[in-house]
Amino acid sequence: MFDCCRVPGPGLDWSVSHAKQGENGRSGHVVVFHRGRVWKLEPWQDGKLLSLDELQRQIQHIYDNTTKEYPGVGVLTASNRDIWAKDFQTLAADPQNAKILSTIHSAAFALCLDTESAPSFISHSRLLWHGAIVPHADGVRPQLGLRNRWMDKPLQFVVSADGKAGLVGEHSVMDGTPTATMCDRVLDLIASPTFAAESNSPLYANHRGSLPIPLDWSVGAATHAAMDSASDAALALINSQALNVVRTPYGKAAVKAFGVSPDGWSQMIIQLAYARLLKAKGWRRNGGTYEAASVRKFLKGRTEAIRVVSEQSDRWVASMNDPQADTKKRVSLLKDAVKTHGAYARAAGNGRGVDRHLLGLKMLVKEGEQMPAMFTDPVVKRSAYWVLSTSAIYTKNFGPYGWGEVVPDGFGVAYVAGFDDFLQFTVTSRTEMPNDEFCEELQRAAKDMYDLFADQVRKAKL
């Protein structure tokens, strides 16, 4: 999570860690990006963390001394990985640039101070996801917020011009749960009424320390051309993506009162909505639904796949679209589906899933060797074609969060089931996919499911 970075290579990336054995966190540096310029900030002085006032002074120094735009080399990190690997070698061939790269790689994390605002839920989400897009007055290549990012860093904290903040996480060596926990702990500290006073106490370095150091790239013609190409490719990718957020008028409190797991309930909303979307479009389901399970209780454990679709979930979905099925039957089938989902989730969390095992076997096949027939079987391939890539993280401080779809004709669905008064779904897809219609179906499915139990409650009161 800290003091490390993803590094591009020909055909293969790797992760470098600069964390020292026995490190207690009382040293190191942070990199700050503003208007494309890179700064090295040392938050520790003489073994003490800088006071809040001193940190503010240092960040103000960065603002005051970055009044123009600098070459946005960071956009290269959003390129196709093989292209970035080639551009990385060109960039690193210059000794000055090599030192900057080393400073970025070894930083605890990156702080990105954007010049663009995020007035809405969606604009804030997109600013975090891929940066803002600012058209040029002369109609040429727009300015991308990606110039102010380093997408290979595991942690990038982004602050927009209107003071909204968020996190961009690099997923290859890190998962969402520990980062969400970290954010909650940090924000709890900041929310404390004694935070400001304590952060300026003698426990912190209040004297004026060394100011942040600007790290300016040496950018030749080849890198300038690479930045233009990277910007064009990034803009095309950004414009190909749709994003919407759905919030229901009820949340965990109501679902638990119905005697149903909020996570299982949320997954069934997704299943019902997707089935109705397919029916409306005349499409056939051609893949599975992935939900992430944590296996962090095992040594080096990360995630396992919960295969959400089951015979029970399909039977329940069919009942919801069958006018002959009564409420009692639908409720019974829903509870069976949620019970099955819970069993699948527990099995995956206990290391009894199948997907990571199959991945391990697949990775044992050496280059040039024939892939075993099992992995080319159409049913096996279709079962792992994740048309719905879903996961749930609960944090009391996040608004929307999410990721892109994992297959061209699929959806990414990040949901939150931990709030008492609403459930939230962040839905991403290619723009050619019916994202708006899927979100409408999510809202309809959520209402129909609520009405099943609300009807029961009304009858019980009578």
Report each predicted region and the residues it spans:
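Acyl-CoA-dependent O-acyltransferases
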Residues: 1-156, 161-462
